[in-house]
Curated annotation (Swiss-Prot):
Record protein name field: Phosphopantetheine adenylyltransferase
Residues that bind ATP: T10, F11, H18, G89, L90, R91, E99, N124, S125, F126, I127, S128, S129, T130
Pfam families named among the record's database cross-references: CTP_transf_like
Keyword presence, Acetylation: no
InterPro entries xref list: Cyt_trans-like, PPAT, Rossmann-like_a/b/a_fold
Protein's organism: Shewanella baltica (strain OS155 / ATCC BAA-1091)
UniProt binding sites for substrate: T10, K42, L74, R88
Reactions catalysed: (R)-4'-phosphopantetheine + ATP + H(+) = 3'-dephospho-CoA + diphosphate
Site positions per UniProt: Transition state stabilizer: H18
GO molecular function: ATP binding; pantetheine-phosphate adenylyltransferase activity
Length: 163
């Protein structure tokens, strides 16, 4: 079966938790599209282009992974990409309710699109982009939570943002 999956997110920035789920999805599906959302309701530190570039760098070793920026409804993006599966990560029980609602909405909008939930490796279960940015903003070392290129880009971004 030729299964194309989409792993959508803001990835601001991509963390080791994201990378772990991407690697595992790449083993499960023939082709994985990392859909990086423009998402106007969030105010990302990195531009869409920067996020696409960082995710490309982190996933360059995965031959069946493609990185694409998008805006608009996820179900429309999935149709454009001819994907039949959405991959979502669940870090904790607290993520489940939101993801459950989202999966049901996506199913209502696109009945043929299945949601598959993956849980992170234990060492990544607490990592979020928000926490990584917060640690970096206060001068903490984020190298254990993100790829080295992401840590460098984040440090440069925060240095530019300081008054």
């Amino acid at each position: 079966m030729h299964t194309r999956a989409i792993y959508p997110g803001t990835f601001d920035p991509i963390t080791n938790g994201h990378a772990d789920l991407i690697e595992r999805a790449a083993k499960l599906f023939k082709h994985v599209v990392i859909g990086i959302a423009a998402n106007p309701s969030k105010q990302p530190r990195f531009t869409l282009e920067e996020r696409v570039e960082l995710v490309n760098r982190v996933t360059a070793h995965l031959d069946n992974v493609e990185v694409v920026g998008f805006s608009g409804l996820l179900v429309d993006f999935a149709k454009e990409q001819k994907a039949s599966v959405l991959v979502r990560g669940l870090r904790a029980v607290s993520d489940f309710e939101y993801e459950f609602q989202l999966a049901n909405m996506n199913r209502r909008l696109s009945p043929d699109l299945e949601s598959v939930f993956l849980t992170p490796a234990e060492e990544n279960s607490f990592i979020s982009s928000t926490l990584v940015k917060e640690v970096a903003l206060h001068g903490g070392d984020v190298n254990q939570f993100v790829h080295s290129e992401v840590a460098t880009a984040l440090a440069a971004k925060l240095k530019l943002a300081k008054p």
